Amino acid sequence: MLMPKRVKFRREHRGKMRGRAKGGTEVHFGEYGLQALEASWITNRQIEAARIAMTRYMKRGGKVWIKIFPSKPYTAKPLEVRMGSGKGAPEGWVAVVKPGKVMFEISGVSEEVAREALRLASHKLPVKCKFVKREEVGGDANEN
């Protein structure tokens, strides 16, 4: 499971998820990507489930990049505990994902295999996603 090695503070505020993703909105490493269309918290377990679904379908061929990291702790109080008396204990880790963020990238497989692998991965995630391709930036090398 993905989680930070160490953190300065054990608990964090929930924060707001307004606007679109600032960075990581294009496919940089691979040829194909899975882009989020809504904002949500994605847990380390959901990221791992999506990764396993992709790699199993690709029969361990190709390469997968995970471009989100669960660095935010979320807390929960035990069951049947009265309100108050402090914030709960850390329960797990989440990655904050905003619309436009490319979460996974794939290369080394055909487009049909990549499309199906990313579709299977998207079913493991709590956000609507879309399949995106890498866009080549710039023109020919011969142009002046």
From Swiss-Prot:
It comes from the Bacteria. Keywords: Ribonucleoprotein, Ribosomal protein, RNA-binding, rRNA-binding, tRNA-binding. It holds the Pfam family Ribosomal_L16. InterPro entries: Ribosomal_uL16 (IPR047873), Ribosomal_uL16_bact-type (IPR000114), Ribosomal_uL16_CS (IPR020798), Ribosomal_uL16_dom (IPR016180), Ribosomal_uL16_sf (IPR036920). One of its GO terms (cellular component) is cytosolic large ribosomal subunit. GO terms for biological process: translation. The keyword Ligase does not apply. GO terms for molecular function: rRNA binding; structural constituent of ribosome; tRNA binding. Binds 23S rRNA and is also seen to make contacts with the A and possibly P site tRNAs. Belongs to the universal ribosomal protein uL16 family. Part of the 50S ribosomal subunit. This is Large ribosomal subunit protein uL16. It comes from Halalkalibacterium halodurans (strain ATCC BAA-125 / DSM 18197 / FERM 7344 / JCM 9153 / C-125).
